[in-house]
């Protein structure tokens, strides 16, 4: 007898795999949480940081991050010492030479360097360099003020980044060398600002030097006092307008200018006078009158009436007993009373510095126009 048929057991239902979120969804969720950090208040951020530091899995998280960094981090090439910036060195040397910046280390030459005037100017009280020193002092003050602001901003930003990296080193691995590398990177970025500041300062100093100290600059006029002193000496010594070195120093002291300026003024004045003598006759008359007034004021009262005029008088014809009086009288006659039919008298002293007009051959020996200037000068 056949065995009874057994019912077929039902097949088990297929297992459903658990639904997993796509990988992109997790990444976007993490990024969204990171972006939400900026919207948190300071209290919320401090609370989250405290919760993370107190979490029992913090050490495990730090170990995983160290392992990941060791596998994927790109090795950073650290330089022992960055090469110095050649442009910054040139700018520093220029600012130091012009007296704008101060040397970092002061040695034996500090005393000698402190006595020198900034910018290579001599230690004189001449008017020519007073404006230059005042402007240079303003540039120096602005430079040090801006440099101090730059250094303060660089220190504050560097300190902020260093503190931030130290805070992050509690969660992720950050080495000391990486902190130093980040600080050097920040300072190199700030050096561009320092370079621009020093470049602008050097340009300002060079512009100042070209305006005040360049030999090719526009000629500056002397003061009225200096001009009067020089002109008075020139016209009172018209026969020999070549002052000695002692006289130049005295004129420079009276006019408040330098000896070199006195020498240049006399050289230019002699050239201009020889080129256009007639133009300077009025000026010569004015300064000659000043010189004669000073001469009369210095003489005794008893002699002033006899020596104050070149015309014949009670003291005899042409009573001139002094060589300077002869020169003064002849110059006055030459400029104020030119003879008719003759020529004006011209000085012939000091290697004919001023060429005289030729004497007419027909002039008699007794004419006033044929007066022998050399004999009078001697």
Curated annotation (Swiss-Prot):
Keyword line: Activator, DNA-binding, Homeobox, Nucleus, Transcription, Transcription regulation
Pro residues: compositionally biased ranges: 1-15
GO MF annotations, alphabetized: DNA-binding transcription factor activity; sequence-specific DNA binding
Keyword Transcription regulation: yes
Record's keyword annotation contains DNA-binding: yes
Protein name (Swiss-Prot/TrEMBL): Pre-B-cell leukemia transcription factor 4
Lineage start: Eukaryota, Metazoa, Chordata, Craniata, Vertebrata
Subcellular location: Nucleus
Family annotation (InterPro entries): HD (IPR001356), Homeodomain-like_sf (IPR009057), KN_HD (IPR008422), PBX_PBC_dom (IPR005542), TALE_homeobox (IPR050224)
Residue spans of biased composition, Low complexity class: 109-120, 356-370
Gene Ontology terms: cellular component: nucleus; XY body
Single GO biological process annotation from the record: regulation of transcription by RNA polymerase II
Domain PBC: 22-214
């Amino acid at each position: 007898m056949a065995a009874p048929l057994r019912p077929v057991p039902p097949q088990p239902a297929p297992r459903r795999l658990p639904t997993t979120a796509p990988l992109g969804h997790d990444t976007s969720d993490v990024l969204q949480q990171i972006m939400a950090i900026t919207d948190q208040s300071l209290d919320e951020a401090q609370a989250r940081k405290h919760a993370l530091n107190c979490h029992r899995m913090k050490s495990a998280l730090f170990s995983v991050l160290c392992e990941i960094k060791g596998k994927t981090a790109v090795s950073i090439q650290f330089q022992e010492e960055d090469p110095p910036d050649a442009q910054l060195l040139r700018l520093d040397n220029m600012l130091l030479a012009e007296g704008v910046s101060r040397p970092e280390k002061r040695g034996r030459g500090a005393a000698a360097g402190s006595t020198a005037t900034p910018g290579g100017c001599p230690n004189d009280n001449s008017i020519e360099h007073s404006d230059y020193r005042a402007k240079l002092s303003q540039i120096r003050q602005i430079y040090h003020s801006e440099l101090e602001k730059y250094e303060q901003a660089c220190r504050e930003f560097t300190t902020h980044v260093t503190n931030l990296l130290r805070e992050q080193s509690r969660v992720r691995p950050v080495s000391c060398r990486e902190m130093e590398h980040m600080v050097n990177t920040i300072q190199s970025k700030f050096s561009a600002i320092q370079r621009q500041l020093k470049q602008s300062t050097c340009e300002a100093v060079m512009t100042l030097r070209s305006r005040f100290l360049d030999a090719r600059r526009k000629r500056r006029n002397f003061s009225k006092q200096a001009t009067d002193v020089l002109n008075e000496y020139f016209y009172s010594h018209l026969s020999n307008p070549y002052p000695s070195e002692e006289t130049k120093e005295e004129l420079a002291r009276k006019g408040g200018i330098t000896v070199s300026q006195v020498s240049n003024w006399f050289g230019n004045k002699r050239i201009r006078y020889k080129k256009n003598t007639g133009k300077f006759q009025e000026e010569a008359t004015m300064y000659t009158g000043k010189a004669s007034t000073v001469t009369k004021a210095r003489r005794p009262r008893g002699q002033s009436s006899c020596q104050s005029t070149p015309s014949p008088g009670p003291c005899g014809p042409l009573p001139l007993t002094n060589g300077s009086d002869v020169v003064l009288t002849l110059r006055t006659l030459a400029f104020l009373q030119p003879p008719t039919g003759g020529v004006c008298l011209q000085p012939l002293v000091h290697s004919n510095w001023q060429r005289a007009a030729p004497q007419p051959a027909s002039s008699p020996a007794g004419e006033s126009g044929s007066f022998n200037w050399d004999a009078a000068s001697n």
